Amino acid sequence: ARGPSSALTSSPVAAAHRILTNAMACMPVDLYRKDGSRRESVEKHPSLYALTVRANENMSPYTFKKVMESKCFWYGEAFAYIDRSGPLMRLIPLPDAHQMYEDEQGGRWYSFTAETKELDLTRKFHEDELLHLRFETGNGRYGIGILQMARDAIRTDLLSQKYAGKFYKQGARPSGIIEVPTKLDQAN
């Protein structure tokens, strides 16, 4: 498969994507604070508004979570800029393509090229400025998406569909003979 648009032509992949992204988008968000070995629910936190009422001026929390989960599904990870500059925190999804750098102290920096009104064309973010979600991961740092994990299976399914389409398009009429050990009549 060459990417999400190609993979979405596979019915099982499209169904899995739709089911997973819709389910994740509907999930309620609860925040907890660790206090030693116990967790306590947090009722007031700057991120609660963005996660439960309005992610940004263009997205509801449902849409934001669906977009982020979709990026995770396809590419293994999703990034959103945590904008703390206004009276309310905003979460702005970032493009999929990025470069990661580490500084001498071990801090991670991510460079994105964006085409949005809110951000510069190319911008570098420290990991503390980002919400970083991963689909599957082997090391906790990088995500692995369905396109990478199931590349061969998706490709096989798409090629099978293509073959079957050509087979029937060329006038194929599969037929065969079925043999049974007894005589068939109207009663059976």
Where are these regions (language model features)?
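Structured, contiguous alpha/beta core segments that scaffold functional sites
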Residues: 1-188
